[in-house]
Regions:
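Core segments of cupin and vicinal oxygen chelate
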Residues: 9-12, 18-61
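Short hydrophobic/aromatic beta-strand micro-patches
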Residues: 18-20, 55, 81-85, 128
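Short, charged/polar surface micro-motifs in flexible loops or helix N-caps
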Residues: 57-62, 71-73, 87-89
Length: 132
């Protein structure tokens, strides 16, 4: 049944994940300046309305930095998990840069090392060490 559903929809992957932000420029400074992402798109599509996408270098999935709809929260647990080559090294770098990170990298049996961090709006993101 799963194969039939995939064939019926034409879905081929994840293109963009949206994160609620209160200030585009501050968010760009964090994601590009601190995390080292590249800015892929920054356009004004209506007066006072911007569409901004950032991504890790070489990634196919982007992150849309978008204002939260009225009444929707900012500072949420996004569930977004980024891959990293070294959770320990990135944890130390981000902590030294003043980023709100967990006190320690998690090391659970059978699970890749990981930790969470918060962006300037309080959105929780995760960095998970990849073996590939």
């Amino acid at each position: 049944m799963g194969d039939q559903a995939a064939a019926a929809t034409g879905i081929t992957g994840i293109g963009t994940v949206g994160l609620p932000v209160s200030d585009h420029d501050r968010a760009i400074d964090f994601y590009v300046g601190t995390l080292g992402f590249e800015k892929r798109l920054d356009v004004e599509f209506a007066p006072g309305q911007r569409w901004v996408e950032v991504a890790p270098h070489g990634a196919t999935t982007t992150v849309a930095l978008a204002p939260a709809p009225p009444g929707s929260p900012i500072g949420v647990d996004t569930g977004v998990r980024f891959r990293t080559t070294s959770a320990g090294d990135d944890h130390a770098r981000l902590k030294a840069a003043g980023v709100d990170v967990d006190p320690e990298v998690l090391h659970w049996p059978g699970v890749p090392p990981m930790f969470s961090l918060r962006d300037p709006d309080g959105n929780t993101l995760y960095l998970v060490e990849s073996s590939a």
